[in-house]
């Protein structure tokens, strides 16, 4: 699902549940604020936990020596922090159940 598809789906669910249609620009802004807020929190080293869904954290990757795949030359890869998502129990169970039902 792309960000655009997510925005369309959010508007559909909101309309079905509340009978009110949201403007596309309002849904787009809401998604943008959510993503920007999460990005800034991770950039400050903060952990994000959404109960029932999962948590976002940072993993540290130490510096290492890699290889340029084209030339085979050794290259120093600097240390970095990368975002990591750990799905929550409820999300794992719902995905597993849905995939099992679709397989039958």
Swiss-Prot record:
The protein's gene is named ihfB
**One GO BP:** regulation of DNA-templated transcription
- PANTHER family xrefs: DNA-BINDING PROTEIN HU, INTEGRATION HOST FACTOR SUBUNIT BETA
- One Pfam family named in its UniProt record: Bac_DNA_binding
User: Which GO molecular function annotations are given, in alphabetical order?
Assistant: DNA binding; structural constituent of chromatin
Q: How does it assemble?
A: Heterodimer of an alpha and a beta chain.
Which SMART domains does this UniProt record tie to the protein? BHL
The protein, known as:
Integration host factor subunit beta
Source organism of this protein record: Neisseria meningitidis serogroup B (strain ATCC BAA-335 / MC58)
Tell me the keywords, alphabetical order. DNA recombination, DNA-binding, Transcription, Transcription regulation, Translation regulation
Query: What InterPro entries does UniProt report for this protein, alphabetically?
Result: Hist_DNA-bd (IPR000119), Histone-like_DNA-bd_CS (IPR020816), IHF-like_DNA-bd_dom_sf (IPR010992), IHF_beta (IPR005685)
Q: Which family does it belong to?
A: Belongs to the bacterial histone-like protein family.
């Amino acid at each position: 699902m792309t960000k655009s598809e997510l925005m369309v789906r959010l508007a559909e669910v909101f309309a079905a549940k509340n009978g009110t249609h949201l403007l596309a620009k309002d849904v787009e802004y809401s998604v943008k604020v959510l993503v920007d807020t999460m990005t800034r929190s991770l950039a400050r080293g903060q952990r994000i936990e959404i109960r029932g869904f999962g948590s976002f954290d940072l993993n540290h990757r130490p510096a290492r020596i890699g290889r340029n795949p084209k030339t085979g030359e050794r290259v120093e890869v600097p240390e970095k922090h990368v975002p990591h998502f750990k799905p929550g129990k409820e999300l794992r169970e719902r995905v597993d159940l849905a995939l099992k039902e679709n397989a039958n």
